[in-house]
């Protein structure tokens, strides 16, 4: 199974300054933003059709050990690959904090590597859903049952729709943006 780099979630202290820097200096666009549990999240991308290459969470502590990167994410081809990885991880005693989470637009397994670095293995669902949001899912369920349960859990959520429609909208938006540059 091939792992493809996807995104990083970074803990920040000055959200507005970080967003301004990454949008104005590095050319990212904000694709979503919102609060979960009183913590602000902002998602940014400059690559079609990715929802985000970077995520910022306003949760960085002022002192202590390095604490700015929440996790590194790797995309796999499909839900069965995520389920297989979950099975492998649960059998490895070096791996801790295994958490299967679906965000409606992805099935993810989060975990800590042997040095407690956060890792995410995920694949896209067939849907786009406004972010941030999420809930647990059971990788031991049959694949069709997981798909049905996920659709049921998120079909009433904001911006719920086919992922390919979202990809087309992102692609069109970025093409228009690039066409307007001199």
Report residues per predicted region.
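Residue-level detector of functional hotspots within protein domains
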Residues: 1, 12-14, 40-42, 58-62, ...
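Vicinal oxygen chelate
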Residues: 3, 13-16, 72-118, 123-130, ...
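Eukaryotic phosphotyrosine signaling hubs
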Residues: 5-7, 67-72
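Conserved short beta-strand elements that form part of the metal-binding/catalytic scaffold
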Residues: 29-67, 112, 118-126
């Amino acid at each position: 199974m091939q792992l493809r780099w996807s995104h990083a979630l970074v803990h920040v202290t000055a959200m507005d300054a970080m967003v301004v820097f990454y949008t104005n200096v590095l050319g990212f666009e904000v694709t979503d933003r919102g609060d979960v549990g009183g913590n602000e999240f902002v998602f940014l991308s400059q690559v079609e059709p990715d929802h985000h290459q970077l995520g910022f969470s306003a949760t960085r502590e002022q002192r202590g050990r390095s604490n700015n990167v929440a996790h590194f994410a790797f995309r796999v081809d499909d839900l069965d690959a995520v389920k297989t990885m979950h099975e492998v991880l649960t059998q490895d005693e070096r791996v801790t904090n295994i958490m299967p989470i679906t965000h409606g637009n992805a099935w993810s397994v989060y975990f800590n590597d042997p040095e407690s670095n956060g890792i995410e293995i995920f694949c896209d669902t067939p849907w786009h859903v406004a972010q941030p949001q999420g809930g647990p899912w059971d990788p031991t369920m049959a694949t069709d049952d997981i798909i049905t349960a996920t659709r049921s859990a998120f079909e009433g959520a904001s911006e719920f729709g086919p992922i390919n429609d979202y990809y087309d909208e992102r692609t069109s938006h970025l093409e228009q943006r690039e066409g307007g540059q001199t």
